[in-house]
C-alpha cells in the first residue's frame, strides 16, 4: 500500500516528519517498508510552453521555441517526440538539470542545431511505464493548459510528495485504504480524522427504470449499483492523475479514475460498466458455469469454473466478480451512460480464482483480505458524486441493490484484570478508556467488566485477545514492563531423538560419508519409488512445480538425484548420507496429516580407494555398504538381521537385504537395480535406508559403568562343513542358540569351497571368544561350552565339525 503523505495530512492533523511517522507506525503494528520522494535526484525541471514547432527535413526531429519563463525569452530545444506540437505545455529540463539515473542535461547541438534543454517524458523522470498514461507512453507528457511557464514541475505533478510504502499483513487489511491509515495515525497520535463528504444531487428519474440487479450466489453478500447518465469521458484533472500515479495506478479516464480513487480512499473496489453496451437491463451476480469464457479488460480470454463469481447480463458474463471487468462493457471515450458497481464478494472464492487465473488486481487483493461493510454504500454514493463533478454526469435517483451486509458494531467484553495479567501492566480503567477513545471505539462498563463496541472498519477484532493487542499497540509496546517468563527449571540434556541423530551423524561421517539435505517434496513417482509398502500420497493442491508436488516416502530417490548431479560433473566417487523425515499417510491426505518418520539413508558409488603405485583400485560393493550399517548398529548396540529380499523393484534382486529388528523390517540395504541406475544416469550404486524412529525404540537405556575385568579371555577355533545354501546369519543364530553366557564374540575368519568338500558343500571357520568377568576360565569349562555349541550347530544347520 502506497500512502501519499500530502493526502494523509488532509485527512488527519499530523505534523511529524515521514521518518518519525514511519518509525511510530512500525512499532505499533503496521510495518513501513520505506519512504520515497518521486522528485529525489531530480532538479531544474519547469513548465514549458511550446511557441513554435518546425519539422527538421529528413529526420524525425523538431526544432522548437519554448517559453520557460526566462527573462531572456524563449529557448530553442530540439525534440524527437512524435507528439510534440506548437501550443502545448510540456516538462522542460533546462541546462544543469538532473533527470532519471542522475543524467545531467547540458547545452548541446543536435544535427548542427543548438538545443538549450530537453523536453521530457514521465519515463525520463524515473516513473515506471506501468503508471504512465497510455496516450503519453511513447512520447512526452503534455500538461494542462493552465500550467504556468517557468513554474517548477515538482508541486505541479506532486513529485515533491512523500510516499510511504506499507507492508500490510492479512489481519490489518483495514489499512488498505487512506481512511483506514488515517484512523491508525489518528489513534497513534491522539488526533481526530476529518473525511470530506460529498452529497449526491439526484435526478428525478429513478435508477430502477434503467437497471435491476439480482444475486444468485452465496458468494455474493451484497450487490449495489447507481446509474450516472450523460457523462463526458475525458482525462482526469491533474491532481487526480498525480494521486493515482503516486499510488502506483495508471490514470485511464475520469470515470475509471474515480473508481480507483474510491478504491484507494475507502478500500472499496468498484467497477464501472458502459450502460449502453449491456444487452439488457437485468444484472445478475452468480457462480460461473464450467467452461464459460470471458474476455477481461486486459484482452485475455479466461475460461471459468464453477468456483468463480461472474456478473452477467442476458446470462452472459460481463465481469469477473471482485477481480476484473470484461472488455465487452468497458468504458471508452464514447461512453455516455455508466453503471457503478459496489459489492461484497467472498474473499476465499476471489483468492482461488485469482490464483488459478494468475490474475492479480488491486480489487482482488482487497476482497481477499476483506472490505469495510460500513462504507460499501457510502463509497458508491461518493463515486457517483465525483462523476457529477468531474464528468458532468446526472445521477439517477436511488440505488439499485440486492442483498445486504451487517453494519452493526461487534461487541467484545473483557476485564481490566484480564488485560493487566496478559500484558504484565498495572493499567487503570482510565488508561483503557483513553486507548479506545483514540481508536474511535465505543466503551461501556467498568474495570470489573467492560464491553467494547468495535466498528466494522476493524473486522480483525472479535475476541478478548484482540482487545489486549489494541491496548498494547496504542498504549505503547515500549512502555510494557520487561519481565522474565516464569517456568520450571529444566535440565539441558539432549532428547533421545537428538542423541540418536548425533550418534548416527558421527558414525556416518566417520565412515567417510558427507551429509546432504534434499528436498522434502518430489514427484509422485519418486515419492514411492523405494518404498516396500507405499502409503497414500500426500500431494500439494497448488505446487510451485510438478517436480515438487508430493511428500517423499523415502530418502533414497532424492539421494540418487544428488549422485547423478555429481556424476554429471565428473565427480564419480560419491559417498553421501542424509538424516531427514519421510511421510507415511494411512488416511485421507485431504483430511489427515501424515506421520513423520525420522530416517537415515546413504548412497555410495565409484571407488573406495583410488589406484596408486602399490594398491589396486577398490570399487564399492555390497559388503562395503553392509560394513557401514554393521558399524552403525554395533555402535548403537542394536542387534539386527539381514534377510535377502526381492520385494523392492528398484533394487537389485540378488544384492538386496531387508534389515530386520525384532521381526520388523526397518530398512533395506543393497545395490540399485541396473535399470533404475540407468534411468537416473548413474553407475553402479549401493544404498541403504533405515527407520530411525524404530531404532530409537530399540535403544538400550544408558548402562552404568562396569569395571573392566582383569581375567583373560579364551579363544577357540571351529571349522564347519555346511551345505552351500546355509548363510552366515543362520550359523550365528545356531551358535547363540546354545545359550553359552560366557561367549562374548564370534568372528568368521575363513570361507572355503572346492572339489575336495564335495558338490553343494562349503567350509566356514569361526573364532569363538569366551570370558568370565569374575574368574579364570578352565579348559574343562571351555570344552563344555564348545560341546554345547557344536551340538546346536549340528541340530540347527546340520554342520559337521572338520
From Swiss-Prot:
MF terms from GO for this chain are: ATP binding; catalytic activity, acting on a protein; magnesium ion binding; phenylalanine-tRNA ligase activity; transferase activity; tRNA binding
Q: What is its main location?
A: cytoplasm
**Domain B5: where?**
407-482
Offer one example of a GO biological process linked to this entry.
phenylalanyl-tRNA aminoacylation
Cofactor annotation comment: Binds 2 magnesium ions per tetramer.
- What is its subcellular localisation? Cytoplasm
Q: Which reaction does it catalyse?
A: tRNA(Phe) + L-phenylalanine + ATP = L-phenylalanyl-tRNA(Phe) + AMP + diphosphate + H(+)
Could you confirm whether the keyword ATP-binding appears in this record? yes
| Residue numbers binding Mg(2+) | 460, 466, 469-470
What cofactor does its activity depend on?
Answer: Mg(2+)
Q: Which PROSITE patterns match?
A: B5, FDX_ACB, TRBD
**Superkingdom of this entry's organism?**
Bacteria
Q: Where are the transmembrane segments?
A: none
In short, the EC number is 6.1.1.20
The FDX-ACB domain sits at 709-802
Taking every annotated instance into account, which residue ranges of this chain make up the domain tRNA-binding? 39-154
Q: Which GO terms describe its cellular component?
A: phenylalanine-tRNA ligase complex
Q: Keywords in UniProt for this one?
A: Aminoacyl-tRNA synthetase, ATP-binding, Cytoplasm, Ligase, Magnesium, Metal-binding, Nucleotide-binding, Protein biosynthesis, RNA-binding, tRNA-binding
This protein's assembly is summarised as: Tetramer of two alpha and two beta subunits.
Q: In which family does this protein belong, per the annotation?
A: Belongs to the phenylalanyl-tRNA synthetase beta subunit family. Type 1 subfamily.
UniProt cross-references to NCBIfam families, sorted A to Z: pheT_bact (TIGR00472), YtpR (NF045760)
Q: What is the name attached to this protein's record? A: Phenylalanine--tRNA ligase beta subunit
Amino acid at each position: 500500500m502506497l500512502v501519499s503523505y500530502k493526502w494523509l495530512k488532509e485527512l488527519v492533523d499530523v505534523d511529524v516528519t515521514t521518518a518519525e511517522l514511519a518509525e511510530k507506525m512500525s512499532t505499533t503494528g503496521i510495518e513501513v517498508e520505506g519512504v520515497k520522494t518521486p522528485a529525489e535526484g531530480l532538479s531544474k525541471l519547469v513548465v514549458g510552453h511550446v511557441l513554435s514547432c518546425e519539422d527538421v527535413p529528413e529526420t524525425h526531429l523538431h526544432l522548437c521555441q519554448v517559453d520557460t519563463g526566462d527573462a531572456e525569452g524563449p529557448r530553442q530545444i530540439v525534440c524527437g517526440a512524435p507528439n510534440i506540437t506548437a501550443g502545448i505545455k510540456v516538462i522542460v529540463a533546462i541546462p544543469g538539470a538532473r533527470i532519471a539515473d542522475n543524467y545531467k542535461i547540458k547545452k548541446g547541438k543536435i544535427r548542427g542545431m543548438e538545443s538549450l534543454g530537453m523536453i521530457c517524458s514521465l519515463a525520463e523522470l524515473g516513473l515506471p511505464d506501468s503508471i504512465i498514461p497510455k496516450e503519453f507512453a511513447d512520447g512526452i507528457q503534455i500538461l494542462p493548459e493552465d500550467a504556468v511557464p517557468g513554474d517548477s514541475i515538482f508541486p505541479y505533478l506532486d513529485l515533491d510528495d512523500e510516499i510511504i510504502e506499507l507492508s500490510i499483513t492479512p489481519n490489518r487489511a483495514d489499512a488498505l485504504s487512506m481512511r483506514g491509515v488515517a484512523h491508525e495515525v489518528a489513534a497513534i497520535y491522539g488526533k481526530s480524522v476529518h473525511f470530506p463528504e460529498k452529497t449526491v444531487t439526484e435526478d428525478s428519474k429513478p435508477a430502477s427504470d434503467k437497471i435491476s440487479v439480482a444475486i444468485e450466489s452465496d458468494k455474493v453478500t451484497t450487490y449495489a449499483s447507481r446509474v450516472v447518465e450523460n457523462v463526458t469521458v475525458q482525462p482526469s484533472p491533474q491532481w487526480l492523475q498525480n494521486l493515482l500515479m503516486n499510488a502506483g495506478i495508471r490514470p485511464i479516464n475520469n470515470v475509471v479514475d474515480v473508481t480507483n480513487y474510491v478504491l484507494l480512499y475507502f478500500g472499496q473496489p468498484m467497477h464501472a460498466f458502459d450502460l449502453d453496451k449491456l444487452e439488457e437491463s437485468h444484472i445478475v451476480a452468480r457462480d460461473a458455469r464450467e467452461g464459460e469464457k470471458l474476455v477481461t479488460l486486459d484482452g485475455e480470454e479466461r475460461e471459468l469454473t464453477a468456483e468463480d463469481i461472474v456478473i452477467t447480463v442476458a446470462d452472459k458474463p460481463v465481469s469477473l466478480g471482485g477481480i476484473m471487468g470484461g472488455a465487452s462493457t468497458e468504458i471508452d471515450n464514447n461512453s455516455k451512460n455508466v453503471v457503478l458497481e459496489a459489492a461484497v464478494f467472498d474473499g476465499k472464492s476471489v483468492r482461488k480464482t485469482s490464483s488459478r487465473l494468475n490474475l492479480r488486481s488491486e480489487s482482488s487483493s482487497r476482497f481477499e483480505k476483506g472490505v469495510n461493510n460500513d462504507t460499501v454504500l457510502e463509497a458508491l454514493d461518493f463515486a457517483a458524486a465525483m462523476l457529477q463533478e468531474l464528468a458532468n454526469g446526472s445521477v439517477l435517483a436511488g440505488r439499485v441493490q440486492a442483498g445486504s451486509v451487517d453494519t452493526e458494531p461487534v461487541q467484545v467484553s473483557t476485564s481490566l484484570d484480564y488485560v493487566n495479567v496478559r500484558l504484565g501492566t498495572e493499567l487503570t480503567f482510565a488508561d483503557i478508556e483513553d486507548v479506545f477513545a483514540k481508536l474511535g471505539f465505543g466503551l461501556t462498563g467498568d474495570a470489573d467488566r467492560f464491553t467494547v463496541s468495535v466498528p466494522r472498519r476493524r473486522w480483525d477484532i472479535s475476541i478478548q485477545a484482540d482487545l489486549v493487542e489494541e491496548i498494547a499497540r496504542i498504549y505503547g509496546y515500549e512502555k510494557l514492563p520487561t519481565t522474565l517468563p516464569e517456568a520450571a527449571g529444566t535440565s539441558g540434556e539432549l532428547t533421545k531423538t537428538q542423541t540418536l541423530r548425533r550418534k548416527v551423524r558421527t558414525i556416518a561421517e566417520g565412515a567417510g560419508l558427507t551429509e546432504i539435505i534434499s528436498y522434502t517434496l518430489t514427484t509422485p513417482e519418486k515419492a514411492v519409488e523405494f518404498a516396500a509398502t507405499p502409503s497414500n500420497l500426500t500431494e500439494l493442491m497448488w505446487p510451485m512445480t510438478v517436480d515438487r508436488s508430493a511428500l517423499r516416502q523415502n530418502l533414497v530417490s532424492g539421494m540418487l538425484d544428488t549422485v547423478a548431479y555429481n556424476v554429471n560433473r565428473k565427480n564419480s566417487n560419491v559417498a553421501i548420507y542424509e538424516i531427514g523425515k519421510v511421510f507415511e499417510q494411512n488416511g485421507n491426505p485431504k483430511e489427515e496429516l501424515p506421520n513423520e518418520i525420522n530416517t537415515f539413508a546413504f548412497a555410495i558409488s565409484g571407488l573406495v580407494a583410488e589406484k596408486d603405485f602399490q594398491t589396486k583400485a577398490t570399487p564399492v560393493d555390497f559388503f562395503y555398504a553392509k560394513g557401514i550399517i554393521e558399524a552403525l548398529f554395533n555402535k548403537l548396540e542394536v542387534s539386527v538381521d539381514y534377510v535377502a529380499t526381492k520385494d523392492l523393484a528398484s533394487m537389485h534382486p540378488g544384492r538386496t537385504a531387508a534389515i530386520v529388528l525384532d521381526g520388523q523390517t526397518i530398512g533395506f540395504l543393497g545395490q540399485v537395480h541396473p535399470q533404475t541406475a540407468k534411468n537416473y544416469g548413474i553407475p553402479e550404486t549401493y544404498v541403504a535406508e533405515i527407520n530411525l524412529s524404530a531404532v530409537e525404540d530399540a535403544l538400550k537405556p544408558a548402562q552404568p559403568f562396569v569395571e573392566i575385568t582383569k581375567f583373560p579371555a579364551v579363544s577357540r577355533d571351529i571349522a564347519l562343513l555346511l551345505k552351500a545354501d546355509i548363510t552366515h546369519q543362520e550359523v550365528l543364530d545356531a551358535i547363540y542358540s546354545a545359550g553359552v553366557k560366557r561367549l562374548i564374540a564370534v568372528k568368521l575368519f575363513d570361507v572355503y569351497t572346492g572339489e575336495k568338500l564335495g558338490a553343494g558343500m562349503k567350509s566356514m571357520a569361526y573364532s569363538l571368544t569366551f570370558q568370565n568377568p569374575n574368574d579364570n576360565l578352565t579348559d574343562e569349562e571351555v570344552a563344555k561350552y564348545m560341546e554345547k555349541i557344536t551340538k546346536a550347530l549340528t541340530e540347527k544347520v546340520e554342520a559337521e565339525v572338520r
